[in-house]
């Protein structure tokens, strides 16, 4: 069993199964140990004083965390990776690694809600100017650059409304002024999109979602390009970040089955959306993998697959009360704000306070769905009975 450095080029499924694994380093066991320890001992002062040892203190890593970091680095094609204790923690660390007091950062108007909250409530305290941009801006983002612009934060597709972005064009423009490009890639996972290959410098995943995949651990990952790695590594050590070893191990376990699960999520989602699109009570589906979606061409160019997160809008005239009654009538779909696990979920979409430069649709009742691993026929039956109960 050889390390990744000596393995031939591999396809994505094979990388997911083997990345970060070195069984011979652990007496032949196929999985690394789950290290529960804070203190690291040295054999002598000659080793201790100059720091000539791989591990010095658990906050800086252990064999468990290094296994996941190595796996993410290989899968993302990165210079290095870091593990955070949640997706939001990963987002905050990534942003703080490339901005300082007096800087200007551009953030997509369709960013994840907690990302906006961090940008609006934390960054101004560091004298960092936050400005939001229309996700459809593409190369025209250069018109928003200032002398103090140092970072552009992207997310594709957009949170709740699923707009696609021309990531390569944005990255090319940003690099002309030496700005760092960040991307929240949680929707697609590193299996279906490789942000660094499109010019992104910091690829961020809420590992809680598809990487863990079982709704039983919280995790975040950050994969850095060569130009962004030094800043991320330096900040990570200074911030005292460390993810719990059991959560890290569950992330490693989830990686091994990521392709199998996402294939099912994608297939189930297409089946459910094909049915939903035929319902007269539904006016629009938001899912970039559909040919009818405005962002389909960008999705097809830059992504190799789609996940289970989508949304739909009710027909005109549907009231807020009817939309909520529909959700209450669901039996299989749980009402919960997370996604990426085995279970199907639904939430009402509320864009109040969530958009700055793009106008949210007025009086449109929308529902976000996460399509899980259940049989799609059962999911369709659940949606059907909820529609009938609500609109009978």
Predicted regions located by residue number:
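Conserved N-terminal alpha-helix of the aminotransferase class I/II PLP-enzyme fold
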Residues: 39-92, 114-121
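N-terminal glycine-rich, Lys/His-bearing helix-loop that initiates the first secondary-structure elements
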Residues: 1-52, 392
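Structural preference for beta-strand elements that scaffold enzyme active sites
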Residues: 151, 180, 202, 284, ...
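Conserved PLP-enzyme active-site core in the AAT-like
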Residues: 2-8, 16-22, 81-279
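Short, well-ordered beta-strand elements within core beta-sheets of diverse protein domains
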Residues: 251-260, 308-316, 367-372
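Conserved small-domain helix->loop->beta segment predominantly found in fold-type I
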Residues: 270-331, 335-340, 351-361
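A common structural junction motif
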Residues: 240, 328-338, 386-392
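PLP-dependent enzyme catalytic core of the Aspartate aminotransferase-like
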Residues: 2, 120, 129-131, 317-318, ...
């Amino acid at each position: 069993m050889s390390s990744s450095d000596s393995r031939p080029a591999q396809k994505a499924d094979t990388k997911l199964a083997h990345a970060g694994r070195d069984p011979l380093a652990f007496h032949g066991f196929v999985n690394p140990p789950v290290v529960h320890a804070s203190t690291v001992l040295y054999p002598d002062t000659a080793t201790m004083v100059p720091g000539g040892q791989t591990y010095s203190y658990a906050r800086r890593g252990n064999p468990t965390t290094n296994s996941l970091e190595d796996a993410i680095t290989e899968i993302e094609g990165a210079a290095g990776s870091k593990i955070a204790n949640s997706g939001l923690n990963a987002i905050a660390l990534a942003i703080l690694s490339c901005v300082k007091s007096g800087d200007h950062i551009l953030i997509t108007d369709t960013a994840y809600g907690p990302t906006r909250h961090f940008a609006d409530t934390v960054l101004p305290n560091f004298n960092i100017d936050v400005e939001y941009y229309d996700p459809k801006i593409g190369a025209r983002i250069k018109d928003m650059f200032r002398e103090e612009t140092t970072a552009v934060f992207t997310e594709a597709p957009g949170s709740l409304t699923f707009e696609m972005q021309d990531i390569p064009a944005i990255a090319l423009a940003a690099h002309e002024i030496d700005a760092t490009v960040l991307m929240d890639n949680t929707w697609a996972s590193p299996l279906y999109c490789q942000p660094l290959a499109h010019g992104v410098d910091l690829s961020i995943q809420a590992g809680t979602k598809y990487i863990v995949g079982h709704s039983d651990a919280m995790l975040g990952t950050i994969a850095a390009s060569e130009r962004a790695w030094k800043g991320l590594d330096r900040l990570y050590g200074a911030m005292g970040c460390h993810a719990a070893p059991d959560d890290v191990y569950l992330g490693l376990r989830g990686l091994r089955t990521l392709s199998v699960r996402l294939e099912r999520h994608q297939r189930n989602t297409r089946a459910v959306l094909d049915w939903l699109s035929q319902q007269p009570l539904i006016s629009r589906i938001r899912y970039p993998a559909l040919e009818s979606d405005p962002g389909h061409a960008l999705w097809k160019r830059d992504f190799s697959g789609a996940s289970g997160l989508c949304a739909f809008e009710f027909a005109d005239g549907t009231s807020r009360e009817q939309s909520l009654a529909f959700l209450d009538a669901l039996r299989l779909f749980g009402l919960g704000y997370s996604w990426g696990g085995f279970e199907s979920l639904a939430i009402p979409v509320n864009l109040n306070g969530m958009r700055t430069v793009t106008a949210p649709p007025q009086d449109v009742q929308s529902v976000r769905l996460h399509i899980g691993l259940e049989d799609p026929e059962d999911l369709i039956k659940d949606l059907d009975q909820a529609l009938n109960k609500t609109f009978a």
